[in-house]
């Protein structure tokens, strides 16, 4: 377990040597896939939590907005809020998560393929598909920082976390591909 902590800390510190160590072991490919899939599922749940909290906030503060809008717009806004709440309360949510997971897995596979093609054709780097997959998977570890979203109701903090972890994940990917 201590070794796993060291790996995670090195990734957060943008240590590009850790990616070389991880990519040299082909057995890390399955771990990278698991990190990627669970990270995207975690991000999806965090985004849904953010949307649900935003709807609750909007519903509670609709009175502040109503005074400046025409009645037809207010009715449309109330209908939209109810429709979104029905999606969260229905069985459609599980289907949405499954389709999100499948789509994110396919987009990740395509992204790894594009990165591999760019590295081998454009940058003329000697690499293989699994190494790029390992780097891509492990660079998604910062996504797990979105877990804070489940414990806070602050909309600005949730926005900051979602955007911040997305940017930090891209920075980690760039550090790993260096």
Regions found by a protein language model. Give the residues of each.
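Selected alpha-helical membrane-embedding segments in polytopic membrane proteins
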Residues: 1-127
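Hydrophobic alpha-helical transmembrane segments and adjacent short intramembrane/lumenal linkers
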Residues: 112-178
């Amino acid at each position: 377990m201590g070794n796993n902590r060291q790996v995670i800390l090195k990734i957060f510190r943008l240590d590009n040597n850790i990616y070389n160590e991880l990519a040299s072991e082909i057995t890390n490919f399955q771990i990278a896939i698991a990190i990627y899939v669970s990270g995207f599922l975690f991000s999806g749940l965090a985004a849904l939590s953010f949307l649900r909290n935003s709807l609750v906030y909007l519903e509670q503060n609709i009175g502040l907005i109503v005074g400046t809008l025409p009645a037809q717009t207010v009715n449309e806004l109330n209908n939209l809020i109810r429709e979104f709440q029905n999606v969260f309360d229905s069985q459609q949510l599980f289907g949405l998560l499954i389709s999100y997971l499948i789509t994110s897995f396919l987009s990740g596979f395509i992204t790894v393929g594009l990165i591999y093609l760019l590295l081998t054709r454009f940058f003329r780097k000697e690499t293989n598909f699994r190494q790029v997959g390992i780097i891509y998977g492990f660079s998604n570890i910062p996504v797990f920082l979105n877990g804070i979203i489940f414990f806070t109701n602050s909309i600005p903090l949730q926005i900051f976390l979602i955007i911040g972890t997305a940017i930090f994940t891209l920075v980690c990917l760039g550090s790993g591909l260096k």
